[in-house]
Swiss-Prot record:
Keyword annotations from UniProtKB, A to Z: Cell inner membrane, Cell membrane, Membrane, Transmembrane, Transmembrane helix, Transport
Induction, as annotated: Repressed by BigR.
Protein name, UniProt field: Probable transporter PD_1892
Subcellular location field: Cell inner membrane
């Protein structure tokens, strides 16, 4: 399989899982909301299977394609921790995450989600440029 098919397949699977979650569970696939409900003691039967799927998906990929994607992170642990906290803060400020706004919200033609996703992308590009990713 060509390396270009992996992101296409990933997008198809994201779309299918989003539609299935909505049709079978009546909920949208906003990861921050799902994890937030779990942390607040929400119904585990509705939320745990989705989170488990997020963990098992990459493992299943590795087994099926006999390939472990190589990922190199050049950042230090303090940078990673601060980045994670900033993402969490932005998720709360934006009332959702990239999956909720970018996948589900845009598909629903939500103006709030379109604006939030544009801000995510612009912020990501600015941060990557500032951090010297594009040299």
């Amino acid at each position: 399989m060509s390396e270009y098919w992996y992101p296409i397949l990933g997008g198809i699977l994201l779309g299918l899982s989003t539609v299935m979650l909505l049709l079978l569970n009546g909920r949208i696939a906003g990861i921050s909301g799902i994890v937030g409900r779990l942390l607040q003691g929400g119904n585990p039967a509705q939320n745990i299977p989705f989170v488990v799927g997020l963990v098992l998906g990459p493992l299943l990929f590795t087994v099926i394609f006999d390939r472990f994607p190589s990922v190199t992170v050049a950042a230090t642990w303090p940078t990673i921790i601060v980045a994670g906290l900033l993402v969490g803060l932005g998720t709360r400020m934006g009332a959702g995450c990239t999956s909720g706004h970018g996948i589900v919200g845009i598909a629903r033609h939500s103006p709030r989600s379109i604006v939030a996703t544009a801000i995510f992308l612009i912020s990501g590009m600015a941060t990557a440029t500032f951090m010297g990713v594009y040299q």
